[in-house]
């Protein structure tokens, strides 16, 4: 069986009226694409910075956020640019916007691997914290509005996301 892409719109006056009349414009579909890819690029940049600073906790968070955003894109569109697409976020020359579309089965396999890597990064962060070597293994509410720097809560969220992707 094939996976089915879906899109749900909340009830707003103008948009709902257009949908009820089957007057769906290109902008309705494009808003998901244009809204989420920059967020995935931000997560990729965060991942790059975490690796550069050897910050395993931040690396785990970045992997989870990247997977969360990309899973929403894949669920909405199916095959999408994935493996090469986010490299653009790290390039100084952003004129190259052409990339291949990757198979969603391969993307899902990679997202599972990313979430497993996130768990491994959190284990490393805890080991560093427990050993007394704390080279930025924690982060605070200043940069973590979701869980106030609580690695265990991020691990639970990542595991919940893993289960959602399995469905």
Residue ranges of model-derived segments:
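Structured, solvent-exposed acidic/aromatic patches
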Residues: 9-65, 71-167
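A short, exposed helix-loop element centered on a Lys and neighboring polar residues
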Residues: 1-6
